[in-house]
C-alpha cells in the first residue's frame, strides 16, 4: 500500500502540479491551499467548496499534518510550552511566547538533533528524523488554534538544526510567508544555526529577509570545540568568514547567541574577544 503524503508540505506551485495531474483546474490548488494554510482545517471533509470525488482522491493520497497536544504547560507570564506528538509517534516541543508586539512561536525542525552541543538536551538521543515542511507549519497552526490568537512572529530555535534540514525548512518558509496562507512576513522570522557553513552560504544565496542568529557560545576554537562539535568542521574563523559573506550577500545584520556557562566561557578573558573581535567587526550584537 502506498504511503500517504503530507499535503501541508506542498508549496502552492507543487500543489497546482499535483491537481493538474489529477485532471483538476488550476484554481482548485489555491482553494485547497487556503483551507490548509489559512483556514487551518485538518480534515478534508471540512473543505465544503470542493467536489466530493476530489476530496475522496485526496483522502486516499494525502494527509493533513495535525499533531496531538500530548502535554501543555502555561507559565504565569502567558508562555505556553507544548509537547506535540506527530503522526508517526515522534514527539517534539513548541513554545508560544507573548510579547507586547504579538505572539512568537518557537518551532522545532527535527525530531532530535545530531549536532551534539554539550549544553543542549535535545541532542542526547541524536537525530531521529527531519520534520517535513507541513509538520513545521502544523506546530504554528496547532498553537494558534489553542491560544485563540494570531501568531505574528516565528523563531526556528526549537529541537533540531534548521540548516541540517535545509530543503524542508525552505519549503516551510515559502508556505508560512505566503499571502495565500497565514502570511507571516520574513522580517518576522528568525532562524538560529550552530554554523553549518556550506548551508549558511546556500541560505545567503536565497537572499531571504529573515533574521539570522548564529550560536557562537565561545570566543575561540578551544572552548567552542569543547562545547560544540560542529566547530571541529567549521572553526570560528571559518564561521566568521561565512557570516561576513552572508551579510554582504543579503544586506541583513546577523546576531550571535552566547549561552554563559559558569567557569567555561563567562570570564572577562572570554568577553573581550567576543566583543571586540566578533561583535564590532560584524557590527552586530549578542543575546546572552
Predicted regions and their residues:
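Single conserved hydrophobic/aromatic residue that forms the stacking wall/gate
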Residues: 278-281, 285-288
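Conserved strand-turn element in the central/C-terminal portion of the radical SAM core barrel
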Residues: 116, 152-158, 188-194, 223-232, ...
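Oxyanion-binding "anion nests"
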Residues: 240
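A glycine-rich beta-turn/hairpin centered on an aromatic-Pro dipeptide
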Residues: 274
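Flexible, acidic/Gly-rich N-terminal and inter-domain linker regions that tether
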Residues: 1-103
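Alpha-helix N-cap and loop-to-helix initiation/capping positions
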Residues: 131, 164, 168, 231-234, ...
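Conserved Radical SAM active-site core
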Residues: 90-210, 220-222
